[in-house]
Amino acid sequence: MYGFGDMIEKLKANPKTIVLPEGSDPRILEAASRLLAGNFIKPILLGNEDEINKSAENAGYNIRGAQIIDPEHYDKFDEMVEQFCELRKSKGMTPEKAIPILKQTNYFGTMLVKMGLGDCLLGGATYSTADTVRPALQIIKTKPENSIVSSCFILVRPAATGENEVIAMADCGININPNEDELVEICGETVGCAARFGVDPKVAFLSFSTKGSAKDDTVTKMQNATKKAQERYPEIPIDGELQFDAAVSPRVAKQKAPGSPVAGHANIFIFPDINAGNLGYKIAQRMGNFEAYGPILLGLNAPINDLSRGCNALEVYSMAIITAALA
């Protein structure tokens, strides 16, 4: 497992509060107990207080120190309803409509972040990705400079000696077929996320073609996206379009992309679509012995992240650290 040492040290100096909507789930409770023991992230558990405490006690998890909030008995609920109606007034939101929506912990938790009562949110242990992302889009919304929410995976291959190998892949989980401008956004957001893991970026825009070796609309898309990204981020080494072997193998790079500032040693990989991205990170995870952390949602005004419903407590703990570190 990736050590998260630098992130934890920074969080100890400046602890963050993370909202956990599925507060009674045993995996969430185990992760929360570990976070509390480390004293660098303050969890807010959402749900029925008696149910949460009973679940923790039965499982032997110490959650003393965690804040527990029940949407059914929240003293600022009227204020939350008012703010939510204001946010959604263009959609015809009324208090009558808002109340049952905000009783759902995914919406309630996202509003806590919006109101400044939590720094970030991690959900999805039982909620679907759509049920985690939808409230984020409606309430937190994208940064002014962004038009989309995207995602990346951070992949870590532990080294027997020396430093771990850390790479990033995007977009593997949100945008099905991003256009040129969206790929540029995905690139910038992924570089920023990878920097939190100490990655010195070398970005490859991937394709089945290298430097015009094949002709296709998808190749043209990656060529144009590369040029736009180079113009927008001139300080970052970016190249494309590159096949994966040219991006990672110095020997192949000499043959296929001589003189490239990236080919042969890329560490951030921008895929043409979600098919390639999703397959790519899973191949790296299952056959390349990389640990995969994500999907990490990018482009929002505050960190909101989504777990796999098949996650374990260690994955919840790891994603909580990543989410808080981005706050």
Spell out what each predicted region is.
Residues M1-A263, I268-A327:
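Anion-binding alpha/beta catalytic cores of soluble intermediary-metabolism enzymes, centered on
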